[in-house]
């Protein structure tokens, strides 16, 4: 526990030391100037700082540079649009209603809105017989092969 407290104290002191040594030193009125070895082209020398550094003040600025004021944000000016919040469910599915489907001429399942029960649409009936629709090879194999329910019983 003592080692942990000592570590926290050392870390706190290190942050204070690094802030003081790595920040550029300020000088002149209201800390406008910077202490440098040599002034930049847009600065002029005013006086001598510590450790043989020159206090340099910008020529372009006025008597001293002011910090810009923070922009004022009025909460009354901010308007949020909550119209989409109620309709968003969080799912990636589209907002189409699944209970109502479009009437199609293809085969498939449609829902009737009145009963909410699935209805299977069948193709229009044609006057065909099984002999005309099935190839001769399939009719021969279907006569010789027993139905699938009987084959399952015979293999057990």
From Swiss-Prot:
One of its GO terms (biological process) is defense response to Gram-negative bacterium. Keywords: Antibiotic, Antimicrobial, Cleavage on pair of basic residues, Defensin, Disulfide bond, Secreted, Signal. Residues 1-20 form the signal peptide. Residues 109-144 have a biased composition (Low complexity). It is found in: Secreted. Residues 108-156 are annotated as: Disordered. One of its GO terms (cellular component) is extracellular region. Residues 68-156 form a propeptide. The keyword Oxidoreductase does not apply. Disulfide bonds join 27-55, 35-49, 39-56. Pfam families: Defensin_beta_2 (PF13841). Belongs to the beta-defensin family. Has antibacterial activity. PANTHER family: BETA-DEFENSIN 123-RELATED, BETA-DEFENSIN 125. This is Beta-defensin 125. The gene is DEFB125.
């Amino acid at each position: 526990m003592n080692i942990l407290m000592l570590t926290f104290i050392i870390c706190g002191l290190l942050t204070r030391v690094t802030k003081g040594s790595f920040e550029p030193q300020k000088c002149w009125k209201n800390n406008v100037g910077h202490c440098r070895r040599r002034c930049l082209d847009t600065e002029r020398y005013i006086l001598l700082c510590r450790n043989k550094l020159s206090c340099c003040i910008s020529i372009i600025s006025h008597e001293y540079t002011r910090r810009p004021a923070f922009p004022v944000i009025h909460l009354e000016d901010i308007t949020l649009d909550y119209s989409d919040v109620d309709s968003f469910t969080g799912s990636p599915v589209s907002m189409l209603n699944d209970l109502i489907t479009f009437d199609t001429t293809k085969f498939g399942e449609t829902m009737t809105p009145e009963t909410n029960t699935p209805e299977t649409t069948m193709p229009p009936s044609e006057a065909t017989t099984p002999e005309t629709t099935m190839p001769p090879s399939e009719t021969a194999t279907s006569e010789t092969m027993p139905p699938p329910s009987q084959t399952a019983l015979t293999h057990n």
